Amino acid sequence: MSFSNYKVIAMPVLVANFVLGAATAWANENYPAKSAGYNQGDWVASFNFSKVYVGEELGDLNVGGGALPNADVSIGNDTTLTFDIAYFVSSNIAVDFFVGVPARAKFQGEKSISSLGRVSEVDYGPAILSLQYHYDSFERLYPYVGVGVGRVLFFDKTDGALSSFDIKDKWAPAFQVGLRYDLGNSWMLNSDVRYIPFKTDVTGTLGPVPVSTKIEVDPFILSLGASYVF
């Protein structure tokens, strides 16, 4: 992922921290809340607005049996809705399942294949099962981390310059860092970042010529939303 992409990612993180800080000030002054905390047997459901930032790296592009040098693609970022639900097996440890409305990836030819324009499009999204560790609260703030495994699924594959476009579903590791703020009455403000790096196979045809390659994708999912403890 390029440095410019990391600068783009940093902005939503700063915005999320600002929102959490503003919520803290408002709630402390206007809405006294008892600490929600977590207990064994609790469920926490979260609904989020999420921004997907993608870094990508194309492997050797095989065209008709030969490698085409200096070929690359860009995918682009997208905004979507996500949902996850966690079950607390203890006051600090939870099992979390995460899904979302699929994001749209638009593969654009770059460098030696830039003249192809839009290569293909596909909807995609991970289904992630994670084990989370929730730290003890700091005032009303509840930080947490998670690690797990996700299945990256691809839907609605659309041809562009590349015909018979296909991209394979893949398993991938998943990492998460998050922070919740207790608003009271079982409601919490949620902010988290997930990272799901994976490499997958892409095939298709360019006219009558078969094309194949591998693409490494490094998506960050930045989310901001509400959580409910029950």
Curated annotation (Swiss-Prot):
Residues 1-27 form the signal peptide. Transmembrane segments: none annotated. GO terms for biological process: transmembrane transport. Keywords: Cell outer membrane, Membrane, Plasmid, Signal, Transmembrane, Transmembrane beta strand. It is found in: Cell outer membrane. InterPro entries: OMP/PagP_b-brl, OMPW. Pfam families: OmpW. Belongs to the OmpW/AlkL family. Could be involved in the transport of substrates. PANTHER family: OUTER MEMBRANE PROTEIN W (PTHR36920:SF1), PTHR36920. This is Outer membrane protein AlkL.
